[in-house]
A protein has these predicted regions:
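Short Gly/Ser/Thr- and Asp/Glu-enriched loop/turn motifs at secondary-structure junctions
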Residues: 100-105, 136-142
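Short amphipathic alpha-helices in soluble, non-transmembrane regions
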Residues: 118-126, 158-165
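PLP-dependent enzyme catalytic core of the Aspartate aminotransferase-like
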Residues: 137-174
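A common structural junction motif
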Residues: 124-132, 165-172
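Active-site C-terminal subdomain of aminotransferase-like
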Residues: 2-94, 99
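Short, hydrophobic beta-strand segments
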Residues: 63-64, 108-109, 143-147
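A short linear hydrophobic-aromatic micro-motif
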Residues: 94-97, 129-134
Length: 174
């Protein structure tokens, strides 16, 4: 299992987490080899990371997790998911086609054709109400939404949806 600490916990980019219950598989996939390497008798950190010399990346991740605690992380993850589901439902109710099952914090939406989808995305970005990006899905242009800030509220989602609707209506007129 891998988790992106940056996307979920808003830690620096290089704070990924790997959970593996097979110690031998983890070590063999990450271990550097060389006759010059001196291994310690205790748990050696270089056996569990893809490089041997690195800064203490774990500090930011550890501090965030320590501050939030189990319940804080739980509230964050479930809160992001709830707001993402809200985003998907409000967009669907407003006439957008939601293409994915919302399993965490991503929504893919499209309009009736690629041209209107592209224009809608451009107008949403120009509005500066929220940020989303474009992508391709099944040979169609889509708008990719990622709800990833702990500070995002239900009202923020509704305001963002209003920006989507305004942009969509304007794109259809052009």
């Amino acid at each position: 299992l891998s988790v992106d600490g940056h996307k979920t916990l808003n830690t620096p980019y290089d704070c990924g987490i790997i959970l593996c219950n097979d110690r031998e598989a983890l070590v063999s996939s990450l271990q550097a080899t060389g006759s010059y390497i001196i291994y310690g008798e205790k748990r050696d950190g270089m056996l569990y990371t893809p490089e041997m010399s690195r800064r203490a990346r774990i500090v930011e991740l550890w501090a965030t997790m320590k501050y939030l605690g189990r319940h804080g992380i739980d509230d964050l993850v479930y809160g992001l998911h709830a707001r993402t589901i809200q985003f998907a439902h409000e967009l669907k109710d407003s006439g957008f086609q939601v293409l994915n099952d919302v399993v965490f914090n991503q929504v893919l939406v499209t309009c009736e054709n690629d041209d209107i989808t592209s224009k809608t995305l451009e107008l949403i970005q120009e509005s500066r109400e929220c940020w989303c990006g474009g992508a391709q899905w099944d040979n169609r242009k889509v708008i990719r939404i990622s709800v990833c800030s702990w500070a995002t509220t239900s009202d923020d989602i509704s305001r963002s949806v209003k920006a989507f609707v305004k942009a969509y209506n304007e794109a259809k007129r052009k």
